[in-house]
Amino acid sequence: MENVRRMALGLVVMMALALSGVGASVMEDTLLSVLFETYNPKVRPAQTVGDKVTVRVGLTLTNLLILNEKIEEMTTNVFLNLAWTDYRLQWDPAAYEGIKDLRIPSSDVWQPDIVLMNNNDGSFEITLHVNVLVQHTGAVSWQPSAIYRSSCTIKVMYFPFDWQNCTMVFKSYTYDTSEVTLQHALDAKGEREVKEIVINKDAFTENGQWSIEHKPSRKNWRSDDPSYEDVTFYLIIQRKPLFYIVYTIIPCILISILAILVFYLPPDAGEKMSLSISALLAVTVFLLLLADKVPETSLSVPIIIRYLMFIMILVAFSVILSVVVLNLHHRSPNTHTMPNWIRQIFIETLPPFLWIQRPVTTPSPDSKPTIISRANDEYFIRKPAGDFVCPVDNARVAVQPERLFSEMKWHLNGLTQPVTLPQDLKEAVEAIKYIAEQLESASEFDDLKKDWQYVAMVADRLFLYVFFVICSIGTFSIFLDASHNVPPDNPFA
């Protein structure tokens, strides 16, 4: 008997709960039937023809996906916050068991047709059509999510130290200002307007290439077109240049250093031209790689392209000047005569200013005259008859080829009567004179050739200093100009 009672009590409780749930569902269904009995979603919710429907527009950013500079397109993941009042969707919560809000499919209610006007893919539709939230006061709020691909004009002058101002323009696609007026969205308390893009910190993922500096919004209208009105959201972002500094700028600086060190490489090394041309090819490769990163525009030249062109010009001149230096280095008296102005500038004037000192040649011990002894009354010239005619005092004389002939004449003219030299001695004297002249000519040839090599070395050192100064000034001036390119504190100033 007790068990029967318990079973009966359970059945009563279950039936009561079931009836209560069915009643709530029926009441909500009844409310929807009453609200939409004569509701037409195609009709603007204005009580009179002249009334304007106020639509509040806000934007919540969840992710800045990518900014494609090549096609000038920004891809973002956002929530569009729309709110308006529909007087036809009002009811008394007390008459419907305290129901204060309803969630209704967005296709069943009127929509203001707010679309992204500067979309880049031709798609004006919302990605996900979520339900709208309708309150008993007639307030309607709709927060659809979307992945927008908007056009963004890229200013490439200071790339990669640039900042961009990308806009997202929203307006009603079918209504003008005489029917729908746009306003900024309100905050959670409904007290003040939110005139900026809201960032959802819980869902936001920071972009690895761009940092968000400012995110204001503004209502725009045209004085020449009173029917036009839009709400524009500005996303001012600054590039993080670390990637380009590490992978482009630092290698270019190293290449420029190699181009400068070309002038420190001795011409006899044989790799002067190879190093110059290799540096030129490296800069060309970097220039081609960066061509795929920036838009194809003629409005301005990116600062990194200007720097690469600057380095390329320097390297090209280093190749040309290396040819000049090698030409100077391999000149000889047989092919070129050194002008006096070259000798004056490159041998006498410039070396002290370039910290170059030419080594002073000192005679080696092997080049000292050889001293021999000759005994008293020694004769070295013989008459044809066989007796000696030239006595020589006991002395130490130096045997030098260039003085031998003059000494013979002195002995012949000073101590004895003139005699005729034998033919074999004449030939020996002529041979010695020829050897002396050849030695002197070879010495002069070597000296002139070394002068040309010295001129080439001075020119190399001069180009080294000049290129170092030009490269340093050019590098600092170009990147110093980029350091002044910062986003403004007031975007609308």
Swiss-Prot record:
Residues carrying covalently attached carbohydrate according to the record: N165
Catalytic activity: K(+)(in) = K(+)(out); Na(+)(in) = Na(+)(out)
Cleavable signal peptide: 1-24
Cell compartment(s), UniProt: Postsynaptic cell membrane; Cell membrane
Keyword DNA-binding: no
Principal subcellular localization: membrane
Annotated Gene Ontology cellular component terms: postsynaptic membrane
Covalent S-S links between cysteines: C152-C166
Membrane topology: Multi-pass membrane protein
Side Extracellular, residues: 25-240
Cytoplasmic side: 329-461
Alphabetized SUPFAM superfamilies for the sequence: Neurotransmitter-gated ion-channel transmembrane pore (SSF90112), Nicotinic receptor ligand binding domain-like (SSF63712)
One MF annotation (Gene Ontology) recorded for this entry: transmembrane signaling receptor activity
Any Pfam family hit: Neur_chan_LBD
Keywords of the record: Cell membrane, Disulfide bond, Glycoprotein, Ion channel, Ion transport, Ligand-gated ion channel, Membrane, Phosphoprotein, Postsynaptic cell membrane, Receptor, Signal, Synapse, Transmembrane, Transmembrane helix, Transport
NCBIfam families linked: LIC
Oligomeric form and interacting partners: Pentamer of two alpha chains, and one each of the beta, delta, and gamma chains.
PANTHER family for the chain: NEUROTRANSMITTER GATED ION CHANNEL (PTHR18945)
Similarity-based family: Belongs to the ligand-gated ion channel (TC 1.A.9) family. Acetylcholine receptor (TC 1.A.9.1) subfamily. Beta-1/CHRNB1 sub-subfamily.
Primary role: After binding acetylcholine, the AChR responds by an extensive change in conformation that affects all subunits and leads to opening of an ion-conducting channel across the plasma membrane.
Name of the protein in question: Acetylcholine receptor subunit beta
Source organism of this protein record: Tetronarce californica
Gene name of the record: CHRNB1
